[in-house]
Structure formats: C-alpha cells, structure tokens
Amino acid sequence: MHSRILLLLLMFAFNVGLINCGQSLVSPQSNCKIRCENGGMCVFDLERPDFHSCICLLGVYTGDRCQIRIAPEDIETTATSDETSHPMNIQHQQSQADIDDARRRDDERKREYERQVAERTRKEKEDRERASDEERRRQQHEQYWKEETARREQQRAEAERRIQEQRVRDDERRRQHEAERSQIEERRREEESRRLAAQRETDEARVRDEERRRQETEKEVEKELNDKRTQSMNEQFEYEGGDEEYPQVAEKEDEYDEGYETDNTEDVTITTTKTTKLMKPMVEESKGVDGDDGSDMIMEKDEMEDDKEPIRKEDEKLIDSIKHVFNKAVDETVKEHPIEEDEYWDETSKKTDEDSWTAENEGTKKTEEADEYGMEEGTEGWMMVKKENENAAVGTTVSLITVTFLFTLIF
C-alpha cells in the first residue's frame, strides 16, 4: 500500500517535471480543445499555443486522451522486482513492448492531431482572412454607397438649386416682358389717340376748307352771274319802234345769205352745240321744275343715284349749293330775257338765187345746229329769234362754269 502511494507521488513529480519542460496547463480546463479522460490534465505547448494535449498519470493510464488503463501487475513488477530471468520479467518485457507500441501510436496520433490542428488552424486563419477581406470589402462597399449617396444628394440639391434659379430668372424675364408689353400697349394707345385727334383735326380742317371753298364758289358764281347779267343787260338791243327795229337782223341775214362765216362764228357754233348738248338735261330739268310737280325729276334722280357711286356728304352739300345757284341764275336769266319777247318776224322776201338759197340754207342749218331755237318758216316769211344767240351764250357760259365746277369737285 505504501509502495503505491510512493509510486503515485513519483508519477506526480514526473508529470510536474514534464509540465515544466515547455508546456503549461490550460486554464480553465474547459477551454481545452480535446477531452482528457481518467483524470488527465490538458496542457498546451508554449511554442504552439493552439496545440493542446493530455498528460496522464504515469503507469496508470496512457493514450492521447488517457483512455487506456495499464494493468496493476505490470506496475508492481516494474517497481519492486529486479531484472531476472524470472517468468515475470519476461511478461514485464512484453508489457514494455506494448508500452512502446502504445507510445508510438500516441506519437502518430499526436502527429495526426497536430496535423489536424494545423489544418484547422490554417482553415481558421483562412476563414479569418476571408472574413477580414469580406469585412474590408463590405466596408469599402458601404463607404462607396455612402459616397455615392452623398454625391447623388449633392447632385439633386444642385439640380434643385439650378431649377429654382432658372425659375427665378424665368419669372423675372416674364415680368420684364409683361412690363415691356404694357409699355408698348400704352405707347400704342397714346399714338392711336394722337392719330385719332390729328385725324379729327384734319377732318375738321377739311370740312372748314370745303365750307370755305363752297362759300367762295357760291360767291364767285353769284359774282360771275351778276357780271354776266350786267353785261347782258348792257348788250341788250334797244328798239326805237316801227320798221327800224330790224336793221341788225337784216345785216346778219345778209351775212348768212352771202355764206360769210368767220372763225369766231365757227367757234361759237361748236361751243354752243357742245354746251347745248351738255346743258340740255339741265334745261329740261329746270323746265320740269317749272312745269310739273317734280315727280319725274325725283324718279330720274333716284335712278341716277342707284347707278352712280355714293357721294360724300361734303360733295352733296357743295353740289346742292351749286345746283341752287344754277337754278337761281337760270330763273333770273329767263325772267330778264324771256324767249317769247325776243322773237320777231322777218318781212323780207325770199331770194330766188339758188346759190344764195343754198348759202342761206347752210347758214340756217348751222344756226339750227348751234341753237335749239333756230329759224322757222312762217305764213308770211321766215321767223327768227333776235336774242336767242345772246341768251344761249349767257346760259352756255353759266352752264359751262357750273359744269366745270361740278367736274372739278367730283373728279
């Protein structure tokens, strides 16, 4: 019994010595990477801290985890007996061989374990490196996304700022455009008002000018009519009575019989003929005014107004004033020089000479062409109008002046 206690103490001392030779206990034992059985202690190598192994009680248990128990007889024989040729020694020698095999197997298992530990360590290192790489990539990715998010946010803010600035510029430009347009509209209204005022002034001036011209025309026509009336009254024949009233007519008739025609006669004939043709409607109109109730004149006037273009009010006023002056002049002329009183009978006998008769007929034809009231054959001789040419000249002059004013004002 005492020998066993001593053996255990020796084994403990031996184990302590082994532990102190480059190894150390794992503390706490629960951190051991392998499970030691039968009271084995877990130790780690100082040079390789990741390598763990089990220290068994010497002579009691063996194996990489202290799982093999050593027989007690072998232990007692080894501790108490000497080396003899006793059969027990042979058994002891055989047990030592088994122990060597067990140690060899332990070494192999230890090497395998070390290899596994190294492989596991390598894998763990690779895993750590892989995890580190992944963490680094993750951090880089997170940093990239942070930077990208910040950049996009900055771009969005910049775009929003540009949009706001563009909107402000557009509003300012729109306000300027509205202000310019309002100014242009105001200037246009002012110009339009000035133009209308100038047009009104021009129209008023034109109306005043036309009124002045109309008054001047009326005055000139009245003055000219008065002059012509005075001239006609001065040139009127004064008859003393009896047979002495016809010498001038006889002389004039002799001139026509002789075929004597001057240039003045031709001019008067042509002018009188043209003027008579132009004034014939006016004379007929004046006769219609004196003879009937004016219905034909109104109808003819309506037809003429339908055929012609519309006349301005100023021209109508001027034409009405001229017509009034013209009608007044015709009435005055007819009153002062009645046609019935100017007729007389030619008591001279007819000439028998065919040449004289031919010349007389030619003169009569010219006189008839020139005057509407020509010579007419009566029961006692030829009837002539004494004042017809003078009246026609006065009426022709008045009509010509009136027509000239009318055409000048209308066209």
From Swiss-Prot:
Comp. bias (Polar residues): 78-97
Region of interest (Disordered), residue spans: 78-312, 337-375
Stretches with biased composition (Basic and acidic residues): 100-230
Cysteines joined through disulfide linkages: 32-42, 36-54, 56-66
Keyword match Signal: yes
Transmembrane segments: none
SUPFAM superfamilies (UniProt xref): EGF/Laminin
Swiss-Prot/TrEMBL keywords: Disulfide bond, EGF-like domain, Signal
Domain (EGF-like) ranges: 28-67
Amino acid composition bias (Acidic residues), ranges on this chain: 237-266
Domain of life of the organism encoding this protein: Eukaryota
Matches recorded under PROSITE patterns: EGF_3 (PS50026)
Protein name: Uncharacterized protein T05G5.1
